């Protein structure tokens, strides 16, 4: 099977290297920029695989491969299509997960091949969830690959009624904390932990013309042995 791989991020490179070790797969090109997509029409691969490719692929490119084009997206579709899918489950309470789906002319809307949910905890930051989603992406792809390779795929259309979509602008807006806005403590903590991704500075507040960056660490209470504590008893 001849494959053109679209990708640029860490998990994309990991899956690319994994595919290159498969005996029945020939990854004939790796594409990281839009202007490189013409190689698909030149090479006419059997399959396009996209992992971390942030551009919308034109319909004429998607129509070339005989086995179609598939994308691995780090969200539980139809929730959190688009950008920063590690952030919105923590802010909005939507399910976190990963999805393998066919590509169409919109972002992350194609028929679902396989997906799995990823558990979140109240102590999670955006970085924690990002790491967990990367692990789940690799697991889902490698487990599903035999079905893809043998063309033994059953798909499920996405439900549009509950889907969500976010842009880079949504993330930028979320990073600006309004000191005058009234929110619950839980909502505030959810926003801070979702935007905490060291060493990057994301969430910030501006006070008297000065910008202050904010992140957070939430720790679950434990007893002296390191186990979760049931409660505290003080004696005087």
What positions do the PLM features span?
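One-carbon transfer enzymes
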Residues: 1-236
């Amino acid at each position: 099977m001849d494959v053109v791989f679209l990708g640029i991020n860490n998990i994309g490179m990991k899956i690319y290297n994994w595919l290159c070790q498969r005996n029945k797969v020939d990854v004939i090109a790796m594409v990281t920029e839009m202007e490189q997509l013409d190689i698909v029409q030149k090479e006419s691969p059997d399959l396009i695989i996209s992992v971390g490719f942030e551009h919308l692929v034109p319909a004429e490119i998607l129509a070339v491969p005989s086995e179609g084009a598939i994308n691995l997206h780090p969200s539980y579709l139809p929730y959190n299509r688009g950008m920063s899918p590690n952030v919105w489950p923590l802010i909005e309470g939507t399910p976190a997960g990963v999805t393998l789906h066919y590509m169409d002319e919109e972002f992350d809307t194609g028929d679902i091949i396989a997906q799995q949910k990823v558990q979140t905890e109240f102590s999670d930051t955006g970085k924690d969830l990002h790491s967990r989603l990367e692990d789940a992406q690799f697991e889902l792809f490698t487990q599903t690959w035999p079905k893809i390779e043998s063309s033994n795929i059953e798909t499920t259309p996405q439900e549009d009624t509950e889907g969500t979509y976010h842009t880079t602008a949504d993330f930028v807006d979320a990073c600006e904390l309004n000191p005058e806005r009234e929110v619950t403590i839980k909502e505030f903590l959810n926003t801070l932990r979702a935007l905490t991704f060291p060493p990057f500075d994301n969430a910030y507040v501006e006070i008297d013309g000065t910008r202050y960056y904010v992140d957070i660490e939430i720790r679950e209470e434990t007893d002296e042995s390191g186990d979760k504590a049931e409660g505290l008893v003080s004696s005087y």
